[in-house]
Regions:
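A shared catalytic/ligand-binding motif for oxyanion handling
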Residues: 1-179
């Protein structure tokens, strides 16, 4: 047994970027000051993959770019020493990006997602939340831990978030069912 008990401290930054291209300097600032283990970005709004470039070479970047429509998009950036691997991704309607990391022999799935808008039809919402449930179930069936970070466009309501000023809407109700 080693005389040093070393533990890995995992830190996560998650944010709706509302367009990352003009904010890369801010992203570099976050990376250099906070040194997060994981960064989950929603609504990157890049038109092609490979546009999210940062000064640090310590990160592996996984992206989901919308193919048919503008907006949206996801990026999950992971420190390379966590041995990240791509697991799965959704599409323009189910914006989900799943990456697996490894810490001290433990597998952890990072689910990064961007939920449907309040005005989207119910079919799209059901498809999205079903996909989230599938990803969670698959991880659980394989005894893999989960980190779930998203912009769910929720309006979660007070039942989920104490003092939420919004009344619960459809996405909030779907999240409540998921929990």
């Amino acid at each position: 047994m080693s005389k040093h008990n070393v533990q890995y401290n995992l830190s996560l930054v998650g944010v709706n970027a509302n367009g990352i291209s003009s904010k890369l300097k801010s992203l570099d600032h976050i990376i250099s000051n906070l040194k997060p283990s994981l960064i989950c970005l929603q609504e990157t709004k890049v038109k092609r993959g490979g546009r999210i470039k940062v000064e640090s070479k310590d990160y592996v970047t996984f992206e989901l770019v919308r193919k048919e429509s503008g907006g949206g998009g996801l990026a999950t950036m992971v420190k390379a020493d966590l041995s990240p691997v791509w697991i799965s991704e959704g599409d323009d309607t189910t914006e989900v990006l799943v990456v697996e990391i490894h810490i001290e022999g433990k597998n952890i799935r990072v689910i990064n997602a961007y939920g449907p808008q309040l005005c989207d039809n119910n079919e799209r919402k059901i498809k999205f939340w079903s996909r989230i449930q599938e990803e969670i179930t698959e991880a659980q069936d394989n005894d893999i831990s989960i980190i779930f970070q998203m912009d769910g466009n929720l309006h979660a309501g007070r039942e989920i978030i104490k003092n939420d000023p919004n009344n619960s809407k459809t996405n909030g109700k779907y999240l409540e069912e998921l929990l």
